[in-house]
């Protein structure tokens, strides 16, 4: 899929290697917030069956999604309690950075520790199960058109849901991590802006790196999510059985629809 300037972390999951082939293009699209999409950008997306918005009510109110012709809109906020203060309570980048720096000044636990807790909490969230169930069923029921699922940056909430979808489709963890970490490439400009904002506010390299820890994708965070899944549910199939109402037939049909033998 062609890169869209207003939504740099929007990407088709097509082409990722899985157990019996590759993820089929035009089925699963992960993204950050869509509010900057223009009509010409929406036209590039092709047929969209549904949009799953995982943002909070406040995030949606400030930056509502644009209308995508023919797409069903489903709002399932995934908000683990620990992430609300430093992600959802502020709107502008300087405000978000200042909010995070409050934790730095108060000697709160390192960003890596806090984010591992956030990622583990998202896996155990009932809303994550609802979102995964919805995406799977939309693909199975609609059969044509892509499903877009997104949060604000397309990193944390979209990252966890993507990892679980790829686990279900049979991707190796190396492919799952590669997809997750691509966010740092897609959002390289935004990451530099966050670091610069922190330096401007406090003038401390250590503080700037602390802030950057909340904005970048880090493999240890995703590892916390996958470890939580494995320890509590033993497998993605166990997760689906306990946290969703997706049947075995629906899971297999989802795989059939989303996997092709060779990449386009």
Q: Where are these predicted regions, by residue range?
A:
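Ser/Thr-glycine-rich phosphate-binding loops at phosphate-binding pockets of nucleotides
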Residues: 153, 157-158
């Amino acid at each position: 899929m062609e890169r869209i300037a207003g939504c740099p972390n929007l990407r088709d999951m097509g082409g990722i290697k899985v157990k019996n082939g590759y993820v089929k293009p035009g089925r699963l699209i992960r993204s950050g917030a869509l509010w900057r999409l223009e009509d010409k950008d929406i036209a590039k997306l092709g047929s969209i069956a549904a949009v799953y918005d995982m943002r909070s009510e406040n995030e949606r109110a400030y930056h509502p999604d644009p209308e995508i012709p023919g797409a069903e809109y489903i709002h399932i906020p995934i908000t683990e309690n620990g992430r609300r203060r430093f992600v959802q309570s502020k709107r502008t980048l300087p405000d978000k950075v200042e909010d995070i720096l409050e934790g730095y000044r108060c000697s709160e636990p390192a960003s890596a520790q806090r984010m591992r807790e956030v990622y583990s909490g998202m896996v155990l969230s009932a809303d994550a199960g609802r979102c995964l169930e919805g995406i799977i069923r939309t693909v199975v029921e609609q059969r044509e058109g892509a499903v877009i699922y997104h949060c604000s940056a397309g990193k944390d909430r979209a990252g966890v849901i993507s990892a679980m979808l790829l686990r279900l489709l049979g991707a190796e963890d190396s492919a799952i991590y590669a997809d997750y970490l691509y966010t740092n490439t897609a959002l390289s400009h935004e990451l530099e802006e966050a670091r610069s904002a922190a330096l401007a506010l406090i003038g401390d390299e250590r503080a700037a790196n602390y802030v950057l820890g909340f904005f970048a994708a880090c493999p240890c965070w995703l590892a916390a999510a996958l470890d939580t899944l494995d320890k509590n549910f033993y497998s993605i199939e166990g997760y689906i059985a306990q946290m969703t109402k997706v049947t075995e037939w629906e899971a297999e049909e989802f795989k059939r629809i989303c996997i092709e033998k060779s990449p386009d």
